[in-house]
From Swiss-Prot:
Stated role: May act as a tumor suppressor.
Protein's recorded name: Neuroblastoma suppressor of tumorigenicity 1
Classification via Gene3D superfamilies: Cystine-knot cytokines (2.10.90.10)
Any Pfam family the entry gives: DAN
Subcellular location: Secreted
Organism from which the protein derives: Gallus gallus (Chicken)
Lineage of the species this protein comes from: Eukaryota, Metazoa, Chordata, Craniata, Vertebrata
Top-level taxon: Eukaryota
PANTHER family: GREMLIN 1 (PTHR15283), NEUROBLASTOMA SUPPRESSOR OF TUMORIGENICITY 1 (PTHR15283:SF5)
Protein family membership: Belongs to the DAN family.
Keywords: Disulfide bond, Secreted, Signal, Tumor suppressor
Span of domain CTCK: 34-123
Molecular function terms from GO: BMP binding; receptor ligand activity
GO biological process: semicircular canal morphogenesis; sequestering of BMP from receptor via BMP binding
Length: 177
């Protein structure tokens, strides 16, 4: 029975991302770092008025390395890659007014609001598609009959600990899809 459990868990262990590296033996005086920096993000859509919102962007230096291979390979490949990415985020609906468009007078945009960042495996895929779909369904069910105010929906965490202050700008513009 123990061999069955070990045999079932072993492939999952091989596929699991390695933990982030904070120090390297070759550079003992250098450390990885990753933090959420406050920005003003411009949310836009073709034919609509843009809105400025407070958000955060992940910025940092995380370690990656690659050691040359041998053939035939005697050990597993020595390649590692970490990237500064969101560790906690939530989604917010931002409603843009589209004057002069009678068919679509406003557009709702889902914006990822970053709460915290950390060094994580480069190949880590965020599960945004499912989260976006669920957020949109929740928004439709919970949307008041009237009122353009922003609605907050959780992805990983529910509350922003402090409102970000602006010192950097990021512009996001989408055309017709």
């Amino acid at each position: 029975m123990l061999w069955f459990v070990v045999g079932a868990l072993f492939p999952a262990l091989l596929l699991a991302a390695p933990p982030p590296i904070n120090k390297l033996a070759l550079f003992p005086d250098k450390s990885a770092w990753c933090e959420a920096k406050n920005i003003t993000q411009i949310v836009g859509h073709s034919g609509c008025e843009s809105k400025s919102i407070q958000n955060r962007a992940c910025l940092g230096q995380c370690f990656s390395y690659s050691v040359p291979n041998t053939f035939p390979q005697s050990t597993e490949s020595l390649v590692h890659c970490d990237s500064c990415m969101p560790a906690q985020s939530m989604w917010e609906i931002v409603t843009l007014d589209c004057p002069g468009n009678d068919e679509i007078p406003r557009v709702d945009k889902l914006v990822e609001k970053i709460l915290h960042c950390s060094c994580q495996a480069c190949g880590k895929e965020p599960s945004h598609e499912g989260a976006l779909f669920n957020v949109y369904l929740n928004a439709e069910e919970n949307m008041p009959a009237e009122g353009p105010g922003p609605h907050h929906y959780a992805h990983h965490q529910q509350e922003v600990e402090e409102p970000p202050a602006s010192s950097h700008h990021h512009h996001e513009e989408e055309g017709d899809e």
